[in-house]
Amino acid sequence: MAKKSKIAKYQKQLQLIEQYADLRRDLKAKGDYESLRKLPRDSNPNRLKNRDKIDGRPHAYMRKFGVSRINFRDLAHKGQLPGVTKASW
């Protein structure tokens, strides 16, 4: 489980990215890099680190499912991920 402050910071960063997305797109199209530089640093989507939707873990994130490898394994064993089966050969 990640610290609650890290999860809160992640949520705040998501809101900033959404808030400035249109303005950022327009400024990039114009080529106005000076105004882009004045936007908040965390409004840049490149700075976003993907986190597990369940417990906020930043490492071993599986993009297709939105969870870390640990939670993926638990959910797969419980049968809560549609289409995921245990491999056997």
UniProtKB/Swiss-Prot annotation:
Keywords: Ribonucleoprotein, Ribosomal protein, RNA-binding, rRNA-binding. GO terms for molecular function: rRNA binding; structural constituent of ribosome. Signal peptide: none annotated. Gene3D superfamilies: 30s Ribosomal Protein S14, Chain N (4.10.830.10). Residues 34-54 are annotated as: Disordered. It comes from the Bacteria. One of its GO terms (biological process) is translation. InterPro entries: Ribosomal_uS14 (IPR001209), Ribosomal_uS14_bac/plastid (IPR023036), Ribosomal_uS14_sf (IPR043140). The keyword Methyltransferase does not apply. Pfam families: Ribosomal_S14. Belongs to the universal ribosomal protein uS14 family. Binds 16S rRNA, required for the assembly of 30S particles and may also be responsible for determining the conformation of the 16S rRNA at the A site. This is Small ribosomal subunit protein uS14A.
